[in-house]
Regions:
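Conserved Class I S-adenosyl-L-methionine
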Residues: 54, 190-259
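Class I SAM-dependent methyltransferase SAM/SAH-binding core
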Residues: 48-102
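A short glycine-rich, Lys/Arg-flanked "PGG" loop and its adjoining helix->strand segment in the class I
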Residues: 126-141
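A short acidic, Gly/Pro-enriched loop at the edge of an enzyme's catalytic core
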Residues: 101-112
Length: 259
């Protein structure tokens, strides 16, 4: 029997929680800096970070936000994130188990909500956005970052296969146009968008998900045998037949819940 999407998420991230806490790509970069700059300008006093993973976004926002609540579906991830935040001297973030589709908060409880590099794991985006809109104050800010989906079908199919082979809990990466459509439908306005690139060192990126040697070898073969335009589109670097790195594009969106 195939595991449900959420069970798959818990299995994958439960086994790799420590690696996510240590991941340099999650700990910082121009993407997190942009979210933080947007966040500072909101002046929100209560922030919810959904799908907090290793807790890096929650930690960054706690430097200037009095109340930060961080939620995630995966219990070991929350334990690792809590220990990480405490180790950084930040003991005020409240970590809580919660599915994004059933957030255990009253309506209009937060001035800002963040969701960074996680929505590609959600079974569906509209129910998640409905919850985000519900827990935000009217006029409140939603800061989203996720892997940007490609508009070109061949390139989109190629990178989806790469992602799913590495992590079967990856569902899809939406295009910019699709995100804008979903956000507007959920009642968000005043959208501001940015795209930044993020380097993915191959050994670290594949290693973090603890692939078997066979699955990793098959993934390498899939990439190396793909049409050259696929590798070029994601700036794959290959030296002496070995994949070294590639580049993801990240979509960042600032949106406001309408009054
Ligand atoms: C890559 S990590 C997130 C990284 C983190 N936000 C950061 O800024 O470093 C993805 C996280 O999404 C969580 N997740 C996936 N599906 C979820 C869901 N339906 N509800 C809540 N969390 C979910 C996983 O458990 C995992 O911890």
């Amino acid at each position: 029997m195939t595991r449900s999407q959420k069970t798959e998420v818990q299995a994958r991230f439960g086994a790799t929680a420590e690696a996510y806490v240590r991941s340099a790509g999650h700990a910082g970069g121009p993407d997190l800096e942009r979210l933080v700059a947007w966040g500072r300008s909101t002046g929100a006093s209560r922030l919810l970070d959904i799908a907090t993973g290793g807790g890096h976004t929650a930690l960054a926002f706690s430097a200037f936000t009095p109340t930060v609540v961080a939620t995630d579906l995966t219990e070991p991830m929350l334990l690792a994130a809590r220990a990480f935040a405490s180790g950084q001297g930040m003991t005020t973030i409240r970590f809580l188990g919660a599915d994004v589709e059933a957030l255990p908060f009253r309506d209009a409880a937060f001035g800002a909500v963040t969701c960074r590099i996680a929505a590609h794991h959600f079974p569906a985006v509209p129910p998640a956005l409905k919850q985000v809109a519900r827990v935000l104050l009217p006029g409140g800010t939603f800061l989203l970052q996720d892997i940007l989906g490609h508009e070109d079908p061949e390139l989109a199919g190629f990178i989806l296969e790469v992602e799913k082979r590495r992590d079967p809990s990856h569902v899809r990466a939406l295009s910019q146009a699709k995100w804008v459509e979903h956000l507007r439908t959920a009642g968000f306005t005043g959208l501001e968008e940015a795209v930044v690139t993020k380097g993915r060192p191959w050994e670290e990126w594949t290693g973090r998900m603890r692939m078997t040697a066979e699955a990793r070898a098959a993934l390498d073969r899939f990439v190396l045998e793909a049409p050259a335009r696929c590798r070029e589109a994601f700036s794959f670097t290959v030296e002496e037949g070995r994949i070294r790195a590639f580049t993801d594009r990240m979509l960042l969106i600032r949106a406001h819940k309408s009054y």
